[in-house]
C-alpha cells in the first residue's frame, strides 16, 4: 500500500500575484519558497509546513472568483469548495482570527464541528479558506466516524481501503525503466545547483 505523506501542493490561480503574496506570505506568515516564470506566466509556492505547499499560477485576464461560503451547495459544473489548513494549537486559531480582524478582513466566529474548531475567511482571489485545530481527545484516525443517515452500499464496506476492487499490479516497473522526464522548473534548479557549487568552490 502506498504511504502518503501529505499534500505536496495545491495549485490555485490568481491574476494578481502581488496581492496574493501580501496575503499568504505577509499576513498568514507562509514563506515564499519557489518562484518561477515571467510576466504573463508565473507559478509561486508558499510553504504551509515542511511537506505541504500551496501554489498560485498567475495568468493574464484572471479575475477573482465570486466568494461563496464554505459548504453552501451549488449546482452545475463544480469540483472545489474550500481549503482547510491545520493549526498546531487552539491559541493559534484565535491569533489568526485577531490578525484577520486587524487587517480589516472578514473572519467568521470560531465554529465547533465536533472534531475540529475552525474559522473561515477568503483570500484576495475569492478562495474560501478554513483554518482548523483538532479537538483534544477526538481521534478520527483511530476511531473513524460515519454519521451519514443513508450511506451507500460502497460506503458501508467500511473505512479501510478495499484493495480487491481494482485490478492488481501484475508487473512492476523495474528500476532500469523508471525514466524521469524534465518538466517546468528542472532547468532552473539545475542552474541554481551549478551556481551554488561555483560559489562554494
Can you annotate each of these PLM segments?
Residues 1-7, 13-34, 48-106, 122-201:
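Glyoxalase I/VOC metalloenzyme domain signal
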Residues 43, 106-107:
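Histidine-centered metal-chelating micro-motifs
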Amino acid at each position: 500500500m502506498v504511504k502518503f505523506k501529505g499534500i505536496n501542493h495545491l495549485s490555485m490561480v490568481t491574476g494578481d500575484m502581488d496581492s496574493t503574496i501580501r496575503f499568504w506570505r505577509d499576513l498568514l506568515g507562509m514563506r515564499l519558497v519557489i518562484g518561477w516564470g515571467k510576466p504573463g506566466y508565473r507559478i509561486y509556492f508558499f510553504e504551509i509546513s515542511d511537506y505541504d505547499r500551496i501554489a498560485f499560477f498567475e495568468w493574464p485576464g484572471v479575475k477573482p472568483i465570486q466568494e461563496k461560503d464554505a459548504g453552501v451547495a451549488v449546482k452545475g459544473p463544480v469540483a472545489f469548495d474550500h481549503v482547510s489548513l491545520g493549526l498546531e494549537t487552539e491559541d493559534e486559531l484565535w491569533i489568526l482570527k485577531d490578525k484577520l480582524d486587524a487587517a480589516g478582513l472578514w473572519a467568521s466566529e470560531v465554529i465547533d464541528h465536533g472534531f475540529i474548531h475552525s474559522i473561515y475567511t477568503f483570500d484576495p482571489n475569492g478562495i474560501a479558506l478554513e483554518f482548523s485545530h483538532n479537538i483534544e481527545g477526538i481521534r478520527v484516525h483511530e476511531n473513524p466516524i460515519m454519521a451519514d443517515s443513508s450511506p451507500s452500499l460502497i460506503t458501508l464496506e467500511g473505512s479501510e481501503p478495499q484493495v480487491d476492487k481494482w485490478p492488481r499490479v501484475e508487473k512492476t516497473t523495474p528500476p532500469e525503466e523508471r525514466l524521469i522526464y524534465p518538466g517546468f522548473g528542472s532547468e532552473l534548479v539545475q542552474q541554481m545547483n551549478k551556481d551554488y557549487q561555483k560559489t562554494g568552490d
